[in-house]
């Protein structure tokens, strides 16, 4: 069995099937509930339905435990963040990262922006209007050409952002890109890591 995503190249899928291989196309979840369904269906596809159900049970238990901690954050104390990739701010309303930030009791600033042209690009002017408490910068040097430190310096010293709260208060944080683009049961770890980055005071004394 070859597990691929619905974003996989169709020609490659057809080639694998022509070789007699069974291909299972896993979905691309955009929220926690869809991720639960993906895990359950994948468990069935590999003949491990019970293990899939157990894994989802563990996910739900961990999320409930996390929620019991984060629900103590008053609505008026929720932080607003803007997450960046190496091109612009990211995380439109309805994207997976938007759902994960909401689960972590974090206001996703980009989700507040009307997306009239259905584009993922977010301008600097829009980021300034959001005026977030925190910037979340990327960490994945996926092609060995991304300068993480250089990008940090450019953001910190960009005149457009000089009056943004995240810059004025030196609130620039990093959450690994493996959590931004999570595609499995590790979504729970992603939500937890976003929460720890933004609300470290709620996790003091815990092992990292």
Describe these PLM feature segments.
Residues 155-173:
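Short glycine/proline-rich, acidic loop/turn segments that cap or connect secondary-structure elements
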Residues 96-119, 174:
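His/Asp/Glu-enriched short active-site or ligand-binding loop at hydrolase and phosphoryl-transfer sites
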Residues 1-45, 122-160, 196:
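Acidic/His-rich segments in extracytoplasmic proteins that coordinate ligands and/or metal ions
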Residues 75-79, 94-96, 103, 130:
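Short gly/pro-enriched beta-turn/loop segments at secondary-structure junctions
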Residues 11-85, 89, 110-111, 167-208:
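Extracytoplasmic substrate-binding proteins
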Residues 86-87, 113-115, 132, 140-141:
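Histidine- and/or cysteine-centered catalytic micro-motif in compact active-site loops
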